[in-house]
């Protein structure tokens, strides 16, 4: 990766983290269209989730509904998504390099 690409990636990560920090303060407390429609169609869901969310409703359970909990939750989520994307990219980059070494296209 050349220096220009590194600067581009660094700027993208910084922008993503800035958005993660500001998002809890800009988000509407009202439910979105899908959520409000689901509440109208099925007001009392009787099922339990198969898996509990680690960051339910973009908060950390230990911090409650505070904006700080939302900020920490968004930053953790952003870092996790970036790490997963990097890992998937590394796997495919490794496969491409292995295919080139073996003479396959």
Curated annotation (Swiss-Prot):
Pfam families linked: PDGLE
Main localisation, per the record?
membrane
Per UniProt, the keywords (alphabetical) are: Cell membrane, Membrane, Transmembrane, Transmembrane helix
Membrane topology, from the record: Multi-pass membrane protein
Q: Which residues cross the membrane?
A: 8-28, 72-92
Q: Where in the cell is it found?
A: Cell membrane
Coiled coil where?
none
Q: List the disulfide bonds.
A: none
Which InterPro entries does this entry report, sorted A to Z?
PDGLE_dom
Can you cite an annotated GO cellular component?
plasma membrane
- Which intervals of the chain are annotated as region Disordered? 32-53
Leader sequence segment: none
NCBIfam families tied to this protein = PRK06287.1-3 (NF004932)
To which protein family does this belong? To M.jannaschii MJ1570.
According to UniProt, the name of this protein is Uncharacterized protein MTH_1706
